[in-house]
């Protein structure tokens, strides 16, 4: 460990200022010795504080407000973000550890890249004195020389950067980003659909607590498509009823099942005898009881003359072939 530097070797701040000693666990004995010597030699108007550098870098605490003098008792190389955190126009004293002469060149380069100014003469061979720039600056980075400003190019102030507007990217990339179809599938994935995927789901409400749920009817000004579904179902039901009504029944209860003897209105069937007189005789073609011949293609009596209700009709075997 190098010989301690007496506190009188450092330039004492003129006026009420704070001296901050930043140390680390690697150099804890030197940190404690320097902090004790500075406190013993500090004037009453000056304040001496000690802090570990990792608390400053982790934002666990902040540096005291200027005017400020900082003593760095740290191993080399210094943390890269420490020099950027030092306030402007602040004098720092870097206490060089022993056996670190090979790293002094990199230390001077790092300080110069952050625009730190050396203070000569140095307090001692093991201590370097520098002053931070008056305005915070970024590390110098080599770049191409900018063209000379012309009449149409505004001159920017020091430290200011012109606003760079983002240009529109490739339109094809934007279209591919929002595309629904994949370019890897020629038909956009339609070939992957099964017939079950293409089937429209039935509008069926499940039972709730064992009770059927009433179906919701479409509004008068429906726009959700429920009205169209209801119209389609009504058309299918009406077509099924019309298909069922095409059946033509003759009077006579020989081959008619019992459940069809009480046919509803609109279908010709076998009614009870007490209601036959009141029943309105109808048929699918509407001509069987109008004195016209049988002309329906599906009628088994096609081509025969008309008969009266209740008349026994006899069909020969030749007519049935």
Curated annotation (Swiss-Prot):
InterPro entries assigned: Anamorsin (IPR007785), CIAPIN1 (IPR046408)
GO cellular component, one term: cytoplasm
Residues given in the record as [4Fe-4S] cluster binding sites: 285, 288, 296, 299
Residue segments, region Linker: 162-199
Entry's Gene Ontology BP terms: iron-sulfur cluster assembly
Record region (Disordered): 124-168
UniProt keyword list: 2Fe-2S, 4Fe-4S, Cytoplasm, Iron, Iron-sulfur, Metal-binding, Mitochondrion
Residue span of region N-terminal SAM-like domain: 1-161
Location of region: Fe-S binding site A: 203-224
UniProt motif Cx2C motif 2: location: 296-299
Metal-binding listed as a keyword: yes
Extent of Low complexity compositional bias: 125-158
Domain notes: The C-terminal domain binds 2 Fe-S clusters but is otherwise mostly in an intrinsically disordered conformation. The N-terminal domain has structural similarity with S-adenosyl-L-methionine-dependent methyltransferases, but does not bind S-adenosyl-L-methionine. It is required for correct assembly of the 2 Fe-S clusters.
HAMAP family: Anamorsin
Protein name per its UniProtKB record: Fe-S cluster assembly protein DRE2
Organismal lineage: Eukaryota, Fungi, Dikarya, Basidiomycota, Agaricomycotina
């Amino acid at each position: 460990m190098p010989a301690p530097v007496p506190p009188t070797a450092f330039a004492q701040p003129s006026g009420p200022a704070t001296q901050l000693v930043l140390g680390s666990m690697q150099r804890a004995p030197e940190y404690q010795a320097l902090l004790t010597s500075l406190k013993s030699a500090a004037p009453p108007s000056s304040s001496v504080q000690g802090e570990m550098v990792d608390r400053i870098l982790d934002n666990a605490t902040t540096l005291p407000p200027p005017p400020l003098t900082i003593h760095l008792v740290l191993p080399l190389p210094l943390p890269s973000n420490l020099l950027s955190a030092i306030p402007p126009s602040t004098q720092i004293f870097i206490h060089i550890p022993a056996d670190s002469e090979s790293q002094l060149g990199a230390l001077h380069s790092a300080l110069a890249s952050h625009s730190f100014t050396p203070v000569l003469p140095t307090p001692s061979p093991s201590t370097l004195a520098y002053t931070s720039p008056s305005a915070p600056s970024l590390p110098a980075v080599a770049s191409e020389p900018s063209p000379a400003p012309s009449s149409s190019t505004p001159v920017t102030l020091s430290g200011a950067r012109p606003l760079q507007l983002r240009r529109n990217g490739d339109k094809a990339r934007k279209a591919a980003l929002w595309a629904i179809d994949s370019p890897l599938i020629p038909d956009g994935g339609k070939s992957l659909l099964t017939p079950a995927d293409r089937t429209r789901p039935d509008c069926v409400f499940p039972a709730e607590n064992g009770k059927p749920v009433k179906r919701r009817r479409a509004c008068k000004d429906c726009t959700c498509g429920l009205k169209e579904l209801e119209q389609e179902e009504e058309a299918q039901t009406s077509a099924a009823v019309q298909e069922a009504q095409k059946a033509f029944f003759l009077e006579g209860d020989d081959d008619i099942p019992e459940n069809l003897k009480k046919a509803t209105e609109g279908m010709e069937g076998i009614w009870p005898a007490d209601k036959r007189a009141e029943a309105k005789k109808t048929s699918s073609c509407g001509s069987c009881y109008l004195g016209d011949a049988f002309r329906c293609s599906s009628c088994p009596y096609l081509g025969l003359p008309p008969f009266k209700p209740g008349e026994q009709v006899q069909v020969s075997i030749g007519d049935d072939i």
